[in-house]
Amino acid sequence: MAFRIEDIELGDDTSLLAELVACWRASVEATHTFLTPDDIERIAGYVPDAIASVAHLAVCRDEGGKVAGFIGVDDAMVEMLFIHPSLRGCGLGSLLLDHAVSEHGATLVDVNEQNGQAVGFYEHYGFEVFDRSETDGMGDPFPILHMRLRPTSHGSA
């Protein structure tokens, strides 16, 4: 299956925003096993605004145009990277991250410590932990690993 990545301006495209939120939810439900259903519902209330406000948003679509995943970058920070769970392991995360690094200078990411698969993905790509926070950005008790791309690693210039 072929995929394409495109930078997008979300604007007032509510149907695309709904697709991205659905991708976020499916991904989080499959990977963030440390969150309760109530946690997911609470966080879901913030997701549309977070997606709409990110400086650079890139979407990965399948041959039929359906959203397969997306990445958001603000300054050098990867703010979000979500892949539809049915397509995990196909290399889409690396494709989106390659795009974010080469096109938007992404070198930083914050990862939930309890999401071991994501931590492993970023480490394999070439990120390393440089700091840790006991709580997430909303003050909830979900520890965050602050990671940066090693200068000589995959994807870096």
PLM region descriptions:
Residues 77-88, 112:
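A short, internal acetyl-CoA/4′-phosphopantetheine-binding micro-motif in the GNAT/acyltransferase core
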Residues 102-114:
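Conserved GNAT acetyl-CoA-binding A-motif
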Residues 110-112, 128-146:
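Conserved catalytic-core motifs of GNAT/GCN5-like acyltransferases
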Residues 48-59, 77:
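A short helix-loop-beta-strand connector motif used in the catalytic cores of GNAT acetyltransferases and
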Residues 1-15, 153-157:
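Conserved N-terminal entry element of GNAT/NAT acetyltransferase domains
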Residues 89-102, 120, 124:
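Conserved acetyl-CoA-binding loop-helix of GNAT-fold acetyltransferases
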Residues 55-69:
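Conserved beta-hairpin
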Residues 22-48:
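Conserved GNAT-fold acetyl-CoA-binding loop/helix
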